[in-house]
């Protein structure tokens, strides 16, 4: 019985080794790491460039300050009662819809950039359309029909 379990474990380890050795798993790992780094770049772009411009265009609106408080502020709270970050740190239950707007903009930017990347990759690997083949002449059936008609005409 112990010998069978050992054999199963060794078999599973062999399968796992084959699975890991395939390029797909390594490609996925690289993609996850690059995706994490790319996400940080997009977050920085959104928070440091895009949202301040949107705030400026909307009259100085700071979207991080848009929230709804759901519970009371603790009596010993000494921070800014209009600061989402400070209230959140104090444990006040809130809905931060301004932060949600920022994250939604992040998502749209990431989705659009991924769309552009996929479109460019697809264009690179796109096979050029082959020109339609020139007609190669009559088919076998058409030739036989011509021969038949010629024989009928002769008599």
UniProtKB/Swiss-Prot annotation:
Membrane-crossing segments per the record: 25-45, 98-118
PROSITE patterns, sorted: MSCL
Membrane topology: Multi-pass membrane protein
KW GTP-binding (keyword) present: no
Subcellular location: Cell inner membrane
SUPFAM superfamilies for this protein: Gated mechanosensitive channel (SSF81330)
UniProt GO molecular function: mechanosensitive monoatomic ion channel activity
Claim: Cell membrane is one of the keywords in the record: yes
Stored HAMAP family: MscL (MF_00115)
Family statement: Belongs to the MscL family.
Subunit structure: Homopentamer.
Function as written in the Swiss-Prot or TrEMBL entry: Channel that opens in response to stretch forces in the membrane lipid bilayer. May participate in the regulation of osmotic pressure changes within the cell.
Full protein name: Large-conductance mechanosensitive channel
UniProt organism field: Novosphingobium aromaticivorans (strain ATCC 700278 / DSM 12444 / CCUG 56034 / CIP 105152 / NBRC 16084 / F199)
């Amino acid at each position: 019985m112990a010998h069978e379990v050992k054999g199963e474990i060794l078999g599973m380890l062999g399968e796992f080794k084959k699975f890991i050795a395939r390029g797909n798993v390594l490609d996925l790992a690289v993609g996850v790491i690059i995706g994490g780094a790319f996400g940080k770049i997009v977050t920085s772009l959104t928070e440091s460039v895009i949202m301040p411009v949107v705030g400026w265009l909307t009259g100085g609106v700071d979207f991080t300050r848009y929230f709804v408080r759901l519970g009371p502020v603790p009596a010993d709270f000494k921070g800014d009662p209009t600061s989402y970050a400070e209230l959140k740190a104090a444990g006040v239950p809130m809905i931060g819809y301004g932060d949600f707007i920022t994250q939604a903009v992040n998502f749209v930017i990431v989705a659009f950039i991924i769309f552009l990347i996929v479109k460019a990759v697809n264009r690179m690997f796109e096979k050029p359309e082959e020109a339609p083949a020139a007609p190669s002449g009559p088919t076998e059936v058409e030739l036989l029909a011509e021969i038949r008609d010629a024989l009928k005409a002769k008599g």
